[in-house]
C-alpha cells in the first residue's frame, strides 16, 4: 500500500505526540530520556540549524525526523571536520502501525533535502539497530566509519 509522506514543521502542538512516542519501547531503546529528548527537540529548532518535522503518512502524524548541521556539534568527535554544508538526519517512527515504512519516509526526506540543495547527508545509527541500518542502506546510504556506539553512514547526491 502506497502512502503519501509529508513533513510538518514541529511546533508545541506536537509535544504531546512526541512525548508519547519517545516513551514507546521501540523508540526508547534507541533514544534517550523522553523529557530530555523533548527539550532538545524544542531547543534545537531555535538556535542551531536543526529543523524538526512530524512525519505524516496520509493525514496521520506517525513520527519525528530532523535535519541538523553536524559541524555545529562535537558531542562524539566524528562531527569534527565535516563541512557546514553536510546535513545530518535523525528519525524515529513512533506509531507502531507505521513501522515498516522507514524506507519510504527516509527516501522522501532525502529527496526534500536534495531539492533544498544539500548534496551530502549523514546518519549515525546505533551499531545494534540493524533494522535501521538496513533501511538506510536500502535508501542508498553507505558506511564510511564507526564510533564505539554508532555506524557512520553517508549519502551523496550523484
Task: List each language-model region with its residue ranges.
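Conserved beta-strand-loop-alpha-helix junction that forms the acyl-donor binding cleft
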Residues: 93, 114, 122-133, 149-158
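Conserved N-terminal entry element of GNAT/NAT acetyltransferase domains
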Residues: 1-13, 158
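Terminal substrate-recognition subdomain of acyl/acetyltransferases
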Residues: 2, 137-138, 142-158
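Helix-loop element at the rim of GNAT/NAT acetyltransferase active sites that forms part
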Residues: 20-34
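Acetyl-CoA-dependent GNAT
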Residues: 41-98, 112
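Conserved active-site alpha-helix within GNAT-family acetyltransferase domains
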Residues: 103, 108, 127-145
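Conserved acyl-CoA
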Residues: 104-120
Amino acid at each position: 500500500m502506497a502512502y503519501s509522506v509529508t513533513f510538518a514543521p514541529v511546533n508545541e502542538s506536537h509535544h504531546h505526540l512526541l512525548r508519547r512516542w519517545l516513551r514507546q519501547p521501540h523508540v526508547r531503546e534507541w533514544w534517550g530520556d523522553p523529557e530530555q529528548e523533548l527539550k532538545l527537540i524544542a531547543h534545537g529548532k531555535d538556535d542551531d540549524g536543526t529543523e524538526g518535522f512530524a512525519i505524516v503518512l496520509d493525514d496521520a502524524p506517525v513520527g519525528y525526523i530532523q535535519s541538523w548541521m553536524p559541524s555545529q556539534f562535537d558531542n562524539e568527535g566524528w562531527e569534527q571536520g565535516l563541512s557546514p554544508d553536510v546535513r545530518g538526519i535523525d528519525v524515529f517512527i513512533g506509531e507502531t502501525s507505521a513501522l515498516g515504512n522507514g524506507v519510504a519516509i527516509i527516501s522522501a526526506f532525502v529527496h526534500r533535502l536534495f531539492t533544498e540543495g544539500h548534496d551530502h547527508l549523514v546518519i549515525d545509527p546505533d551499531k545494534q539497530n540493524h533494522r535501521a541500518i538496513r533501511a538506510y542502506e536500502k535508501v542508498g546510504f553507505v558506511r564510511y566509519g564507526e564510533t564505539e556506539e554508532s555506524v557512520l553512514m553517508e549519502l551523496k547526491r550523484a
